[in-house]
Design a protein with these regions (language model features):
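Short, small-residue-biased leader/transition segments that mark boundaries at the very start
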Residues: 1-3
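Phosphate-binding/switch loop-helix module in NTP-utilizing enzymes
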Residues: 11-52, 59
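Structural motif
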Residues: 41-43, 70-72, 101
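Anionic group-transfer/hydrolysis microenvironments
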Residues: 45-46, 76, 105, 128
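Charged helix-capping and loop-helix junction motifs
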Residues: 53-60, 84-87, 110-114
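Inter-motif core of Ras-like GTPase G domains
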Residues: 53-75
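Active-site beta-alpha connecting loops in nucleotide-dependent enzymes
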Residues: 73-81, 85-88
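C-terminal lobe/tail of nucleotide-utilizing enzymes
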Residues: 87-143
Length: 143
């Protein structure tokens, strides 16, 4: 299920702006049709506590589906704090975390992965164009 609206906003706000309010039950039903039939990847927009439907957050959808989540954080200054806050939020909602991915947009010399691994036992993967084959190999081990 892919929802596209003209307004660049949260899915909740965009759906209200378009006159087609999006309800959590609609998202759950669209996703559950696929669960058990094949590999299911559900991409949220924003973070764990970002609105995704009328009066619903990404965390509500994740909890309803019961699928493991992947936390993706831009690999930059502040990434460790952002990742740890997201991990804490997911844990408080009793969501299963498959891994954290540090997504490197621009080459950097930060040691965010090493720092993050010191604070969590959750697998931490690093993605960059230069390391894409290694990333895929590590990700396949988790699936």
């Amino acid at each position: 299920m892919c929802i596209r609206d003209r307004l660049e906003a949260s899915p909740e706000e965009a759906s209200l702006d378009s006159g087609r309010p999006l309800e959590l039950v609609d998202l759950i039903n669209a996703c559950k049709i696929q669960v058990g039939k094949r590999f299911v990847f559900v991409e949220g927009a924003g973070g764990i506590y970002s609105p995704i439907a009328n009066n619903a957050l990404n965390s509500d959808l994740a909890a309803a589906l019961g699928l493991p989540i992947i936390i993706i954080v831009k690999d930059e200054l502040g990434a460790v704090g952002q990742a740890l806050l997201s991990i804490n939020a997911a844990n408080s909602q009793k969501l299963k975390i498959a891994c954290v991915v540090l997504n490197e947009f621009e080459p950097n010399h930060l040691s965010n992965a090493q720092a993050l691994r010191a604070y969590t036992k959750i697998p931490v993967l690093e993605y960059s164009r230069a390391k894409s084959k290694l990333f895929l190999s590590e990700a396949e081990k988790l699936i």
